[in-house]
Curated annotation (Swiss-Prot):
Naturally occurring in which organism (per UniProt): Homo sapiens (Human)
Cytoplasmic side: 1-46, 106-116, 207-248
Lineage summary: Eukaryota, Metazoa, Chordata, Craniata, Vertebrata
Stated role: May be involved in signal transduction as a component of a multimeric receptor complex.
UniProt record similarity statement: Belongs to the MS4A family.
Membrane-topology descriptor: Multi-pass membrane protein
Protein name: Membrane-spanning 4-domains subfamily A member 6A
C-alpha cells in the first residue's frame, strides 16, 4: 500500500479583531454548535448575576429584621456582634454590585466592564468569606445563649410581687422560640452567603480568563494556495499579529 502525497497546508493564527475576509473567501464554519454554546454561557452568566443580586437582597432584608427586632439580653449579644460587624449591610452591597456588573458585562463586553466585574467578584467573594466565618461563629453561640436564658428564667428573684412581675416581663418570650427564630434567620443568611461565595469565585475565574487570556485569537486552517491569494503573504509579513506555522 503506497502512501498518497499530502498537499501542503498553512496554519495561520489570526487575532479576532483582524479577521475580515470577503464573503467569497470566508471559510465555512467547522463547528456551528460553538455559537450556540456561547449563547448558553452568556445566558448562564446572566442567571448567576441575578442570583447574586437576590442573595444580596435576602441578606440585607434579614439584617434589617435583626436590627429592628428585640430579643432577651442573652440573645442580644449574639445579634449585636453580627450587626456591629456591618456584614448584613456591607456584604449585600458587594453582592448586588457584583451581580449587576456581571449582567452589564454580558450585555456589552468591553475591557473596562470585564475588569470591573473581576474586581467586583473578588470583593464579593472576600466579603462572603468573612460573612461566612462571622455567621458560623454566631450560630455556634446560640446554644450557650439559650441555656443561659433558661437558667436566668428559672432564677427570677421572687422577693416581692413588683420585682417578680418586672423580671417575668423580660422573659415573656420563650427562650426556645427566640433561639429557633435566630437560628432560622442565621441559617438563611449562611446559605445565601455560601451560595454567593461560590458564584463570586466562579465569576471571578471566568472574568480572569477573559481579561488575561494569552492569545484571544482564532485558528484557521487554510490551503497553501490560499496564501498567494489577495496579497495575504505580504500582509502577514508586515503584521506582527499573525503567526505562520508551515508544515511540509
Amino acid at each position: 500500500m503506497t502512501s498518497q502525497p499530502v498537499p501542503n497546508e498553512t496554519i495561520i493564527v489570526l487575532p479576532s479583531n483582524v479577521i475580515n475576509f470577503s464573503q467569497a473567501e470566508k471559510p465555512e464554519p467547522t463547528n456551528q454548535g460553538q455559537d450556540s454554546l456561547k449563547k448558553h454561557l452568556h445566558a448562564e452568566i446572566k442567571v448567576i448575576g441575578t442570583i447574586q443580586i437576590l442573595c444580596g437582597m435576602m441578606v440585607l432584608s434579614l439584617g434589617i429584621i435583626l436590627a429592628s427586632a428585640s430579643f432577651s439580653p442573652n440573645f442580644t449579644q449574639v445579634t449585636s456582634t453580627l450587626l456591629n460587624s456591618a456584614y448584613p449591610f456591607i456584604g449585600p452591597f458587594f453582592f448586588i454590585i457584583s451581580g449587576s456588573l456581571s449582567i452589564a458585562t454580558e450585555k456589552r463586553l468591553t475591557k473596562l466592564l470585564v475588569h470591573s466585574s473581576l474586581v467586583g467578584s473578588i470583593l464579593s467573594a472576600l466579603s462572603a468569606l468573612v460573612g461566612f466565618i462571622i455567621l458560623s461563629v454566631k450560630q455556634a453561640t446560640l446554644n450557650p445563649a439559650s441555656l443561659q436564658c433558661e437558667l436566668d428564667k428559672n432564677n427570677i428573684p421572687t422577693r416581692s410581687y413588683v420585682s417578680y412581675f418586672y423580671h417575668d416581663s423580660l422573659y415573656t418570650t420563650d427562650c426556645y422560640t427566640a433561639k429557633a427564630s435566630l437560628a432560622g434567620t442565621l441559617s438563611l443568611m449562611l446559605i445565601c452567603t455560601l451560595l454567593e461565595f461560590c458564584l463570586a469565585v466562579l465569576t471571578a475565574v471566568l472574568r480572569w480568563k477573559q481579561a488575561y487570556s494569552d492569545f484571544p485569537g482564532s485558528v484557521l486552517f487554510l490551503p497553501h494556495s490560499y496564501i498567494g491569494n489577495s496579497g495575504m503573504s505580504s500582509k502577514m509579513t508586515h503584521d506582527c499579529g499573525y503567526e505562520e506555522l508551515l508544515t511540509s
